[in-house]
């Protein structure tokens, strides 16, 4: 489907560029740069995998487990013999149908992705005049937009990181936010997110961690709004970071613009099989049970950290916690000496110094973390 050459912002309205939009775009471009020079590029490209290493107790990466469950590994292994052939269109159709059924959507409302990162990289194709990115949050969307020369306005939330639609510039025709939000673990009410909608604006919600919350409250994945685009990822819940699987849910016309110009066979056979397998009813039930365990582990982990005088941000809904200590970088390095990896917090726009992100883990791993913290001078209270 050819992209509309007259479409120069996310949701075309045909009213031209307003003076307010031009002014905001100029301010954002001056403040945050274009695709030519991005001084903080390395910070925006930093991810938790850079903070961990082989053999470490990993609190830095939010993937649940070290490998996919056995049944999923068997499903993928059964398709290895098919790798000598190009991906079958029937497999793509099956994957889209499975995702559509899982969320109560039509297959036309599903765009399969080679990981959530590919979805973020597609956003500049919508030609927004001014993008607003809500922070603190995952940094990949902002980087993708800025590298494409899209003016970006940062909407930085202050603790307790409550979303206020009034903070978003009215001129923004593209708004990107996470729910639940990485790294704050805040879950925004769906009604507040939909309050961001405006004529000519597209709202993109990164729900990469939504299935890590039992019942997926506040999710918009099953809602039909032509101006809301939802991004999902298989990486975290199913330990598939190395396979790169995800999908967009949204209006078919918007998905067509994102898909235009894409390379043929964007997903391979194993990726398509993984999408189909994890969208089935049994897999969804397993994911829900896992989310219940995460909630229990989180509830047990928070008081143990607080008993050491560590500030833990709440409310926390996701499979990770945002903590604050006097010298975060020193603590991160000292914990690494004890074989424990935690995620830097200073690379997230809007976070004050002293923040770290720690994945929610089970009792045995938390024991290791607490023991190391005590050895480093944190006293039980």
What are these regions (language model features)?
Residues 153, 158-214:
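Active-site phosphate-binding strand-loop segment of PLP-dependent enzymes
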Residues 124-146, 151, 158:
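Conserved PLP-anchoring active-site segment centered on the Schiff-base-forming lysine
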Residues 2-86, 98, 171, 201:
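N-terminal "arm"/small-domain region of PLP-dependent enzymes with the aminotransferase-like
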Residues 294-295, 305-338:
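Conserved PLP-binding catalytic core of the aspartate aminotransferase-like
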Residues 92-95, 99, 107-131, 246:
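Conserved beta-loop-alpha segment that forms the PLP phosphate-binding cup at the N-terminus of a helix
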Residues 2-3, 337-338, 349-381:
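PLP-dependent enzyme catalytic core of the Aspartate aminotransferase-like
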């Amino acid at each position: 489907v050819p992209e509309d050459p007259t479409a120069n912002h996310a949701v075309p309205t045909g009213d031209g560029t307003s003076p307010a939009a031009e002014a905001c775009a100029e301010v954002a471009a001056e403040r945050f740069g274009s695709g030519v020079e991005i001084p903080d590029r390395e910070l925006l490209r930093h991810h938790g995998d850079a903070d961990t290493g082989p053999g470490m107790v990993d609190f830095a990466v939010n993937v649940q487990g070290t490998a996919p469950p056995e049944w999923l590994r068997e499903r993928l292994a059964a398709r290895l013999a098919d790798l000598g052939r190009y991906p079958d269109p029937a497999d793509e159709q099956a994957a889209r149908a499975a995702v559509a059924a899982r969320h109560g959507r039509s297959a036309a409302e599903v765009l399969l992705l080679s990981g959530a990162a590919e979805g973020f990289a597609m956003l500049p194709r919508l030609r927004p005049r001014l993008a607003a990115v809500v922070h603190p949050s995952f940094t990949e969307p902002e980087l993708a937009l800025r590298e494409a020369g899209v003016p970006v306005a940062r909407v930085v939330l202050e603790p307790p990181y409550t979303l206020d639609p009034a903070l978003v510039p009215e001129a923004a025709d593209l708004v990107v936010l996470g729910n639940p939000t990485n790294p704050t673990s805040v879950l925004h009410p769906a009604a507040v997110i939909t309050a961001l909608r405006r004529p000519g604006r597209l709202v993109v919600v990164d729900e990469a961690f939504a299935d890590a919350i039992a019942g997926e409250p506040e999710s918009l994945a099953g809602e039909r709004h032509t101006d809301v685009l939802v991004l999902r990822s298989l990486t975290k819940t199913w330990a598939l970071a190395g396979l790169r699987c995800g999908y967009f849910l949204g209006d078919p016309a918007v998905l067509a613009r994102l898909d235009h110009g894409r390379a043929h066979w964007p997903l391979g056979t194993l990726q398509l099989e993984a999408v189909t397998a994890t969208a089935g009813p049994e897999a969804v039930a397993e994911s829900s049970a896992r989310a219940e365990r995460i909630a229990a582990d989180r509830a047990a982990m928070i008081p143990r950290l607080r008993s050491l005088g560590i500030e833990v941000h709440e409310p926390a809904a996701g499979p990770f916690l945002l903590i604050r200590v006097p010298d975060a970088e020193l603590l991160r390095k000292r914990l690494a000496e004890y074989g424990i990896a935690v995620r830097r917090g200073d690379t997230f726009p809007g976070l004050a110094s002293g923040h770290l992100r720690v994945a929610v883990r089970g009792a045995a791993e938390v024991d290791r973390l607490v023991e190391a913290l005590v050895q480093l001078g944190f006293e039980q209270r």
